[in-house]
Structures are given as structure tokens and as C-alpha cells.
Amino acid sequence: MVSKVVKVTNEQGMHMRPATVFSVAVTPFESDVKIGYNGMQYDGKSVMMLMAACIKCGAEIEIICNGSDEEAALAKAVELVESGLGD
């Protein structure tokens, strides 16, 4: 298991478009990808779960990856969040 805490820089937070971009990008990885926020963990491969988390701009989230390609999954997930999630 690997993890990293990152700050959400997207001005609108994790709304439909960024949640979709994130989910589509991490789904091909075999590893589980979870987002830790406000004491809860959310499935990073589920658009609905990401939207339900109500993650706002400036929030610190923990990206947690566990599986055979966890390092690559974490690198991709961190890159997406740090780049603004396509917005």
C-alpha cells in the first residue's frame, strides 16, 4: 500500500467533470484506488462516490493505492489532482 496527501487545486472542487476524469484515468489500474477525506474513504474508481465526498478546492485528500501496480496508480492519481483534474 502506498499513499500521498495532496491539495485539490481545481477551483470548483471534485464536481462531475473532474470526478469523471479522475475515475476514468485510474480505472485501468489493477490496484484499488481510494480517496481519504474528512475521516472517510471513497472509491476513486466511482464517479458517484467521488461526487458524494463533496471535496472542495483547497481540501487536502489522501490518495491510497493498494495492489500490483500501486506505484503507477498513485503517480497517475497525484498527477491528475495536482494538474487541476482537467479543468
Regions found by a protein language model. Give the residues of each.
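A composition-driven signal for long, intrinsically disordered, charge-rich low-complexity tracts
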Residues: 1, 16, 30, 84-87
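C-terminal structural segments of small proteins and small subunits
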Residues: 52-87
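Intrinsic-disorder/low-complexity, polar/charged segments enriched in Ser/Thr/Lys/Arg/Asp/Glu/Gln
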Residues: 1-5, 60
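Compact, glycine-rich, soluble single-domain proteins
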Residues: 7-57
